[in-house]
């Protein structure tokens, strides 16, 4: 379901997520900050409960993405919002970023 814009509209993507998601399942979507309202509206229209799970920053001041948490029920939606910062003030990767990607990259 990655790169939905190539094949599916936001509305169609939410319909597919709803159809494929188990009643106790979780879906996490990495979305642009500019698309958040569209995703939240589309999720609500198909009956998915949603919560912004994580805000992703390129650096300490530049918000670039959100991780949206979707479920069929709202019982297990986490109420806290996490922050994830890729680069620090020295433009070096943060420990958080390195730790998250260490299994995928050899030299960070």
Name each model-derived stretch.
Residues 63-108:
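SAM/dcSAM-binding transferase cores
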Residues 32-46:
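Short alpha-helix
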Residues 1-16:
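Mobile active-site "lid"/loop adjacent to the S-adenosyl-L-methionine
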Residues 18-23:
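Helix-to-beta-strand junctions that scaffold the AdoMet/dcAdoMet cofactor pocket
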Residues 48-58:
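Conserved S-adenosyl-L-methionine
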């Amino acid at each position: 379901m990655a790169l939905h814009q190539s094949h599916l509209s936001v509305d169609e993507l939410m319909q597919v997520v709803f159809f494929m998601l188990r009643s106790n399942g979780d879906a996490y979507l990495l979305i642009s900050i500019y698309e958040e309202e569209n995703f939240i509206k589309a999720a609500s229209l198909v009956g998915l409960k949603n919560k912004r799970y994580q805000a992703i920053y390129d650096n300490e001041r530049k918000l670039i993405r959100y991780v949206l948490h979707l479920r069929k029920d709202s019982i297990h939606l986490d109420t806290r919002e996490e922050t994830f910062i890729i680069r620090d003030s020295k433009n070096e990767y943060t420990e958080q970023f390195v730790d998250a990607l260490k299994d995928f990259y050899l030299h960070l």
